[in-house]
């Protein structure tokens, strides 16, 4: 092969290794990004689905539960059976002897077998025990006019609004056959949280603890965490690709400029 010359060019040290490493890193990063997005979608949609099964939203039209729940507030009620209701719960119920065409939101202060009266030193008493009610409006007393001692029949509930002076609650129905009480079976939900405006979960009614166990909070916080974490993973995983490509292009330009300067 006369007349021909062979010129061998040595590969640049480290060039192939750098490119291979970048490709390997990019592939791993893309896989992790895909996993993050998939997990995020599962958490996000799973949180919404769980919430739809467990909770039902309600809009409270009156101020009878102020300051716990104001008129127009949007709340989440955990779907429960009436036998799950405990003292201190804020519940949603329907009783046509109270309101014919709407649900009502009030606080349970006594259950079947309890004796409720008002007032001892300005406090509501249940089974002779004065109840500490920090959720009442500032400066408000629990004292109500024309509130005789009531023994709650089995299977029924005695309910009051937190804004005692203006609430049409059990005290407004004392002359009814049920003495102002409501059947447990009328309850459809227990209010866990106020979601609009975002006041968060209701405080536990610890003043009733001496009379028996309180209801356990629902999964509102867990569901909220799932939705938020899922959203973060979807956004973070989805943003990885464009950011990684931008960084790769920046590194490539840097290597090209460095090679041209040699």
Segments from the language model and where they lie:
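Extended hydrophobic leader/signal-anchor segments used for secretion and membrane insertion
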Residues: 2-262
């Amino acid at each position: 092969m006369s007349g021909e010359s062979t010129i061998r060019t040595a590969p640049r040290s480290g060039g192939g290794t750098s490119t291979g490493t970048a490709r390997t890193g990019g592939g791993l990063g893309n896989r992790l990004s895909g996993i993050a997005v998939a997990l995020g979608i599962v958490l996000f949609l799973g949180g919404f689905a769980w919430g739809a099964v467990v909770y039902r939203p309600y809009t409270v039209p009156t101020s009878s539960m102020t300051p716990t729940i104001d008129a127009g507030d949007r709340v989440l009620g955990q779907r429960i059976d009436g036998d799950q209701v405990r003292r201190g719960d804020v519940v949603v119920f329907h009783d046509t002897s109270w309101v014919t065409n709407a649900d009502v939101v009030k606080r349970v202060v006594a259950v079947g077998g309890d004796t409720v009266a008002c007032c001892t030193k300005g406090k509501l008493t249940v089974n002779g025990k004065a109840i500490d009610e920090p959720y009442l409006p500032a400066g408000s007393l629990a004292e109500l006019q024309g509130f005789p001692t009531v023994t709650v029949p089995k299977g029924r509930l005695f309910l009051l609004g937190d804004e005692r002076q203006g609430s049409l609650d059990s005290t407004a129905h004392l002359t009814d056959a049920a003495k102002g009480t409501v059947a447990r079976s009328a309850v459809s939900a227990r209010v866990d949280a106020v979601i609009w405006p975002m006041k968060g979960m209701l405080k536990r009614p610890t003043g009733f603890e001496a009379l028996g166990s309180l209801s356990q909070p629902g999964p509102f916080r867990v569901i909220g965490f799932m939705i938020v974490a899922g959203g973060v993973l979807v956004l973070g995983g989805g943003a990885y690709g464009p950011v990684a490509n931008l960084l790769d292009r920046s590194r490539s330009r840097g290597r090209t400029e460095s090679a041209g300067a040699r």
